[in-house]
Every structure is written in C-alpha cells, then in structure tokens.
C-alpha cells in the first residue's frame, strides 16, 4: 500500500517537474497567485494572520523549488557544487519559514516556546552560514541565500543556443564549427572567424563567474562576515540577560552591524553580488529606527503622526497609510520582521 502511494507521489513529482521545465512562465504565475492569495487572506478572520503567513511562506518555497528544477535542467554545468547548493537551499528554506514558525509557536505553546523557536532557528542559520564561510569560502553571504533565477534570461539563452546549433555544423575530424550558407551574412557584415556555439552563455544568463563565486575576504573580511553572522545570537543572549526594554541589546547589535559593514567596506575586488549585498546591509541600518526600544521611545509617535497626516490630507494615500498604521503594532511584535 505504502509503495503504491509512493509511486503515485513520485509520478506526480515527475509530472510537475516536466510542467515547470516546459512552462516557466506558468510556474511564475502560479507563485504570484499563491503570494496574492496570502494578501487576500490577511485580516479576513480570527486566525487569518497565521494562515496568510503560511501561504506566503509556501509561495517562497514554491519559487525556491521551481528555481531549483530550472537550474538543474537548463543550466549546464550547475552554478555550484552539490553540497554547497544544498546548504544554501536549506538556509533559504529556514528563512522562508522562520516567521510562520515564530507566530505558530507563539499561538500553539506560548511566549516561551516562541523565543525557543527563534533561538533554534537563529542557531541553525548561524551554523549553516559559518560552514559556508569557513569551509566553502563563499565570501559575503547574500539574502536570500539562493539568488532568484533569471528565468527570462535562461529561456532566451536556450533559444539562442538552439538557433546557433541549427545554423552551423561541427566537423567530425576537425571539430570546427562552420556556418551554413543560408545563415552566412553578406561579405561586408561578416566576421571571418569560426562561429562560437556557446559564446556569451554566461553573459546572456545575466551571471558571470565573478558574480556567482565569493571573493577572497582575507582575515579582516572573514572576521567582519563572522561578526555579521553571529550578531543575531549575540542580540538574543543580551536580550535574555538584560531584558527587552534595555538599551544594551539594541546598542550592541547596532555596534556589531556597523563594525561589520565598516570592515567589509575596506575589502577590495568584491563581486557585483557582494557589492549589492553590502549596500543592502547599509540600507538596513535604518531598521534600527524601527526596532525597540528606539521605536517605542522616539519613532512611534512621529511615524504615526506622519502617516495620519498623509492619510488625511494627501488624496489616495489614505488607502496605504491607514492599513499601515493598523499593521505596525503587529509588525513590531514579530521578531523576524524586525531582527531577522
């Protein structure tokens, strides 16, 4: 009985893989539909927030699954080795589920279980990132861990490769690629070199080796990235020691983030992906204005006043400002929205 259900599940899995490979656009629309459903559910009934977050997490997992299928089938060779890719994937799964696990644990077992779940998730994420940093030398680690696939670029690449392979043939003995007469340009527009079947493959995909591989950070750069990885653990431990109303956890976390960014800014020859991630971390320093206790003491009254003025006096902005005012208290209570 179990073997029969397993075979059916495997057949369904294979059919879904074939669907994603043949219809990448349809897979993208499916992900967008699930994500839109999460927005429609929010606020509709008593447990809508938990269900909405579950649906939203499912959309992220679906996108991760579909990207993995397309990478495996359409990219040759795969961008990274198998074990490293698996670690990045598990890290992506944790980041996709962390908010739902937090609010689910709080709903089912109370506040202590919520903080236990937060600590376990942060420990798992830190362990995975430390292994990636010191064992696989991935350099500055981005968020999300697995870069979303440029599906349009992959499809264009596959079409171009198909056209290129059909417009020339390769000699059996010489292994030289020769254009067919029908696809040869006129003499004044022709390049007199052999056609390159795989030319520009990485550039068309929008990724180069320099973008995909981590840079050599050196001792200070590695230390800075380790500080960034361990900052959530340090913050949680200081919260447990000093309490949630104390300024010490907030100041310690801010100091660690600023130190990490300052040291990484001195590292040269960063890849494009790493430079984007570093700019993202600089921007996220603004989040400290929305993190307690700074938010409770300074930002909250000013921000709510600004939103109220925008909603009352700027036509059309009330549709955005008023729901945002209602959602801010909920957002403040969820750790991974603020500190994740």
Curated annotation (Swiss-Prot):
Membrane topology: Multi-pass membrane protein
Any one Gene Ontology BP term: peroxisome organization
Location(s), subcellular: Peroxisome membrane
Residues in the Peroxisomal compartment per record: 111-114
Region spans: Disordered: 196-215
Keyword line: Membrane, Peroxisome, Peroxisome biogenesis, Transmembrane, Transmembrane helix
One Pfam match: Pex16
GO CC list: peroxisomal membrane
Coiled-coil regions, chain positions: none
Function: Involved in peroxisome biogenesis.
Protein name per UniProt: Peroxisomal membrane protein PEX16
Record organism: Xenopus laevis (African clawed frog)
């Amino acid at each position: 009985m179990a073997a029969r259900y397993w075979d059916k599940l495997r057949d369904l899995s294979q059919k879904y893989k074939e669907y994603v490979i043949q219809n990448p656009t349809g897979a993208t629309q499916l992900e967008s539909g699930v994500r839109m459903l999460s927005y429609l559910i929010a606020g509709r009934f008593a447990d809508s927030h938990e269900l909405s977050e579950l649906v939203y997490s499912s959309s992220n997992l679906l996108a991760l699954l579909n990207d993995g299928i397309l990478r495996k089938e359409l990219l040759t060779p795969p961008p990274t080795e198998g074990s490293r890719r698996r670690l990045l994937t598990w890290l992506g799964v944790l980041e996709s589920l962390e908010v739902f696990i937090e609010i689910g644990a709080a709903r089912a077992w109370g506040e202590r279980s919520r903080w236990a779940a937060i600590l376990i998730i942060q420990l798992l994420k830190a362990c995975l990132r430390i292994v990636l940093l010191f064992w696989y030398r991935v350099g500055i680690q981005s968020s999300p861990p697995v870069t979303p696939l440029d599906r349009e670029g992959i499809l264009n690449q596959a079409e171009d490769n198909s056209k290129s392979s059909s417009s020339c043939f390769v000699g059996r003995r010489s292994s030289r690629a020769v254009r067919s007469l029908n696809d040869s340009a006129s003499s004044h527009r022709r390049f007199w070199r052999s056609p390159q079947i795989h030319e520009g493959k990485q550039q068309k995909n929008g990724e180069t080796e320099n973008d995909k591989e981590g840079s050599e950070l050196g001792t200070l750069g590695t230390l800075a990235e380790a500080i960034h990885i361990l900052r959530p653990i340090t913050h949680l431990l200081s919260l447990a020691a000093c309490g949630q109303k104390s300024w010490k956890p907030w100041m310690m976390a801010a100091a660690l983030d600023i130190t990490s960014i300052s040291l990484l800014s001195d590292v040269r020859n960063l890849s494009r992906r790493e430079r984007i991630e570093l700019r993202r971390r600089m921007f996220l320093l603004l989040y400290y204005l929305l993190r307690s206790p700074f938010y409770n003491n300074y930002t909250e009254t000013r921000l709510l006043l600004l939103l109220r003025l925008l909603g009352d006096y700027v036509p059309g902005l009330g549709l955005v400002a008023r729901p945002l005012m209602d959602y801010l208290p909920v957002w403040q209570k969820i750790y991974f929205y603020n500190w994740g």
